[in-house]
């Protein structure tokens, strides 16, 4: 389903990238006196911010449209969250901290809740 892919990319994957790379890793670069490297990613952060405004509106509208839509979105979100977290864990643990990926997961879950989703997650 194209909307499942839309949700996976724009909410889950981009959510992890934003939190881990453009928040946590960027902050680490600043603490290592590498602010000039962090500045190189400014365009990507701006682009993801613009995309987020649009994709959040689309997801929020789809979730509010019907109970069936909300149920599907919740199922897709819950299924993809664990896979994406597992994919980012090795890098996040090596580059940042052991709990970095958990912080990113919580940020993505909070964003999903703001969009009207109610993910049925064991650890949330």
Role assignments for model-derived ranges:
Residues 14-95:
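Long, repeat-rich segments with strong aromatic
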């Amino acid at each position: 389903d194209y909307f499942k892919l839309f949700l996976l990319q724009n909410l889950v994957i981009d959510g992890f990238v934003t939190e881990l790379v453009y928040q946590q890793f960027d902050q680490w670069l600043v603490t290592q006196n590498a602010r000039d490297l962090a500045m190189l990613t400014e365009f990507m952060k701006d682009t993801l911010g613009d995309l987020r405004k649009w994709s959040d509106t689309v997801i929020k509208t789809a979730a509010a449209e019907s109970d069936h839509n909300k149920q599907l979105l919740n199922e897709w979100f819950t299924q993809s969250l664990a896979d994406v977290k597992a994919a980012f864990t090795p890098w996040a643990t090596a580059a940042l901290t052991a709990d970095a990926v958990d912080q990113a997961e919580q940020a993505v879950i909070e964003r999903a809740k703001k969009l009207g989703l109610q993910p049925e997650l064991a650890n949330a």
